[in-house]
């Protein structure tokens, strides 16, 4: 499916479609006129003698050097080639597709002054499956994501490497196979392509989409754990959460309440249970997961604005003047990435404590040790819980803020930077870890509710358990566990666990 982009008003769910489905995108034709107008203004400046940054001058600390008109195309080509300094593994294809779509949005507002040919080329690359090889490391998040976006731009010029329908090859060959021609950059176009926050923003969006899927999954696994531990649903009473007033908490409490509705296990111990209160990892799920949902909603608002922004420099303004500014500084994205990291860390931390509760017979209210039917002879989920602790601890270390760690670059011209790019990139690893924790919780919780038989859990949670059991059989005796963990994690990461739940129960992501 091809998403039609209207710069300035692209909704978050369109960007999520591109990310989750390796989608294509194109600019709404009604924006072509703005692009043509901006390009004409830059061509007019390039034909004159007045020095304007990025059009007929050097870059960064070299901005005071005037460039001859005959060298303007060479200036832009040199800019791209010299800035291709990324290192590390290539970014995932769906992230690069998101980068390219975000660049279409930014350029499509007409304030960058690029020709319509660049827009058409990016659209064609997305449609035909020409995906630039962008090394994952090299940006400090100001002045824009220079190195990664230079690698994207190099492919447009026929330089560097690209994937064509999943196969890596020289960019010129990828373009040729797709029937596309490389571009010769005109005045300012190289700068417009690399001077923006699109790499950081795409990575932050990927982290957000994954974190929200995990947050939804955690409500399902948390409800399963609550029933497996014969926990109380009383703390999910709506009035408790309304009295506090936080939307995320209200939504989380509602989800947990609805997920547990109709559980035979819960009905069996409403009366006569000598326990007065459950541990916090059961009782305080709405407060913890709800706070994380609120944090992700705040991030969503920031990133939807940034996704629709023009983050180039200089910009062609509405009065046709060309003015230098600092929209390339990715501080909002850096803060958003740090916020997402906190939410990811805490969702995993409380989930891990639920796993620990379920495998401990001193806490699990009658479940066998490590959820094994024959403990002693079998170790059950003993080391699966240890793995979840390792993943949780790793996320704690990675959750420390990146945004406060500025360092001066480029001969002190770029003396404060955001560190948004690696702050956002770590979210991929952190959400992988979180999917791991939640996959292990799903294994433990489903095993736990089954051990409560013949009593059944709720109809909604039965559907979730069935999805897990379609991938992982019941653990009767010890077996090679890595296969089980991998399959359970995929059930969570793929969204299959969330998809099993009836629409309207789990909170959706809204900016």
Curated annotation (Swiss-Prot):
Signal peptide: none
One of the Pfam families matching this protein, by short name: Lyase_aromatic
A single Gene Ontology CC term: cytoplasm
Keyword Cytoplasm: yes
Molecular function per GO: histidine ammonia-lyase activity
Subcellular location field: Cytoplasm
Modified-residue entries (2,3-didehydroalanine (Ser)), positions: 143
Name of the protein in its database record: Histidine ammonia-lyase
Organism from which the protein derives: Rhizobium rhizogenes (Agrobacterium rhizogenes)
